[in-house]
């Protein structure tokens, strides 16, 4: 059996201003729910996704109106844009002409070789990568006939078939996804893919469900895959506002220490000792830190006895007691604050630490560029 390719060993592929693969960073992706030809609505949704922490966004391109809108959308957003293309190679060509940053296709359903070659040549000329999207629900007929039903081996065979089409045209800026709605199938498919080739992998559990059920299902499947060192980009697919997809993705990556640009909240589950409204305070603080782009850890705890010790790894936190709270940094009590002002005091400290972290990151960036 081939050795599994860790995410840090995958081939680097440029997508806009991002490098996907060849490092330990996972890029968060989402997809718009608007009609792509409605430029105003699509841009507005992408702006909300950007603010939530989305790093790459995909749009459906089912017709010429959508393809023609790409250029206008690109002018108004700040993150790489991906075109989702099926069947009609001319839509891919139009999207590439409009400045798209990546194309998602299956070379096998684009048609004859000259059509695939036209897309590949256009992508080569612009330095645009292609994502091969393998999906358990739409495997080729000959693969289903061979295996009887969707299997991990069949999905890998499909991926290798599409990869070969591109490689035969001397195209190697490839990203691959191996999506399934069955969690165990997805885990097996991604693991086998990581043993079969070294192209970057885009992770996802497709058709995972509504906000609550889909979050649980995606976290279970993608968590197992991430823990194996697999994956370079990911999307949490939910039947919900796509901003929720980004929020869940950020939380999932934070859980594995794979998000260097997101704040983390530590809060206790509450018990009979609690004498403050911890749940509403935790929700307020979580919302406050949700858009921070630094790895600050914030703790909100209800017990002044155990709180600081339980969250000694937090950069800043509060532990509530009757009528007052303890403000602490790295487990050390800084000062006592009245209960009615402790949340505002915590927010002030968060702002100070976040600014310090941002300045330090900028300094490191300048040093690296010298």
From Swiss-Prot:
Keyword annotations: 4Fe-4S, Iron, Iron-sulfur, Isoprene biosynthesis, Metal-binding, Oxidoreductase
Gene Ontology MF annotations: 4 iron, 4 sulfur cluster binding; 4-hydroxy-3-methylbut-2-en-1-yl diphosphate synthase activity (ferredoxin); 4-hydroxy-3-methylbut-2-enyl-diphosphate synthase activity (flavodoxin); iron ion binding
Cofactor: [4Fe-4S] cluster
EC number: 1.17.7.3
UniProt-listed GO biological process terms: isopentenyl diphosphate biosynthetic process, methylerythritol 4-phosphate pathway; terpenoid biosynthetic process
Catalytic activity: (2E)-4-hydroxy-3-methylbut-2-enyl diphosphate + oxidized [flavodoxin] + H2O + 2 H(+) = 2-C-methyl-D-erythritol 2,4-cyclic diphosphate + reduced [flavodoxin]
Pathway: Isoprenoid biosynthesis; isopentenyl diphosphate biosynthesis via DXP pathway; isopentenyl diphosphate from 1-deoxy-D-xylulose 5-phosphate: step 5/6
HAMAP family (alphabetical): IspG (MF_00159)
Role this protein plays: Converts 2C-methyl-D-erythritol 2,4-cyclodiphosphate (ME-2,4cPP) into 1-hydroxy-2-methyl-2-(E)-butenyl 4-diphosphate.
Record-given protein name: 4-hydroxy-3-methylbut-2-en-1-yl diphosphate synthase (flavodoxin)
């Amino acid at each position: 059996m081939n050795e599994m390719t860790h995410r840090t060993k995958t081939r680097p592929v440029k997508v806009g201003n991002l490098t996907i693969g060849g490092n330990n960073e996972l890029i968060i992706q989402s997809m718009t729910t608007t009609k792509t030809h409605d430029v105003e609505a699509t841009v507005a949704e992408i702006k909300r996704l950007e603010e939530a922490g989305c790093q790459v966004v995909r749009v459906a391109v089912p017709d010429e109106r959508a393809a023609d809108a790409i250029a206008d959308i690109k002018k108004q957003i700040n993150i790489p844009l991906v075109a989702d293309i099926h069947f009609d190679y001319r839509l891919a060509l139009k999207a590439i002409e409009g400045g798209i940053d990546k194309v998602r296709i299956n070379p096998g359903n684009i048609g004859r070789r000259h059509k695939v070659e036209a897309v590949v040549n256009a992508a080569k000329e612009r330095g645009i990568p292609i994502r091969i999207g393998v999906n358990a629900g739409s495997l080729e007929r000959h693969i289903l006939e061979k295996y009887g039903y969707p299997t991990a081996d069949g999905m890998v065979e499909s991926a290798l078939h599409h990869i070969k089409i591109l490689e035969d045209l001397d195209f190697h800026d490839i990203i691959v996804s191996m999506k399934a709605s069955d969690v165990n199938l997805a885990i097996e498919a991604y693991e086998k893919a990581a043993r079969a080739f070294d192209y970057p992998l885009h992770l996802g559990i497709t058709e995972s469900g509504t906000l609550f059920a889909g979050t649980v299902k995606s976290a279970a499947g993608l968590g197992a895959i991430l823990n194996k060192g697999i994956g370079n980009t990911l999307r949490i697919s939910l039947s919900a506002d796509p901003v929720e997809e980004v929020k869940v993705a950020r939380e999932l990556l934070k859980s594995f220490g794979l998000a260097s640009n997101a704040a983390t909240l530590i809060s206790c589950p509450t018990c009979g000792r609690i004498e403050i409204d911890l749940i509403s305070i935790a929700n307020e603080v979580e919302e406050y830190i949700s858009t921070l782009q630094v790895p600050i850890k914030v703790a909100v705890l209800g017990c002044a006895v155990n709180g600081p010790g339980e969250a000694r790894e937090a950069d800043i936190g509060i532990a509530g007691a009757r009528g007052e709270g303890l403000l602490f940094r790295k487990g050390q009590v800084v000062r006592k604050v009245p209960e009615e002002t402790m949340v505002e005091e915590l927010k002030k400290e968060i702002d100070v630490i976040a600014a310090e972290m941002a300045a330090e990151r900028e300094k490191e960036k300048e040093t690296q560029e010298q």
